[in-house]
Regions:
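Globin-like tetrapyrrole-binding proteins
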Residues: 1-139
Length: 139
């Protein structure tokens, strides 16, 4: 594992130590858009937090180029497209994630945040591309 990958993994686990990390994320994310808040209106957040934990790990693994992760990211992209997630929502998601990391990772730095953004954008761009190709395939 590269030093940058180790740094992100360590940051992820530092954030996870604080049980409020995912609550902070969802509070911030849902407050950014009434449309997003409505999409989560009937969500079982206990389950959703488990899904997010797993998705974040998958995204970190995809950033490292680990085998088998592209398929999971593509599956996430298709699922999000079916739910009506737009590219703009991914940007709000990423901002909310970085805000939560800043609050809950005691070792946060601007450079670490930039690395998080780069790693997550790799997966986000893949998810958006898969969703766009799904729409193109229907046409």
């Amino acid at each position: 594992m590269t030093e940058q990958a180790e740094e992100l993994t360590a940051s992820y686990y530092r954030c996870r130590r604080d049980e409020r990390f995912l609550d902070t994320f969802y509070d911030g994310f849902l407050s950014k858009s009434p449309t997003i808040a409505q999409m989560f209106a009937k969500t079982d957040f206990k389950f959703q937090k488990l899904v997010l934990r797993q998705s974040l790990l998958e995204m970190l693994c995809f950033d490292r180029g680990m085998s088998g992760t592209r398929e999971e990211i593509e599956r996430l992209g298709l699922h999000h497209k079916e739910l009506g997630v737009t590219p703009e929502m991914y940007a709000l998601w990423l901002d909310s994630l970085c805000e939560a990391i800043k609050k809950h990772d005691p070792c946060h730095t601007p450079a670490l945040e930039q690395r998080w953004r780069e790693a997550m954008l790799k997966s986000i761009e893949e998810m958006i591309a898969v969703g766009a190709s799904q729409v193109a395939d229907r046409d």
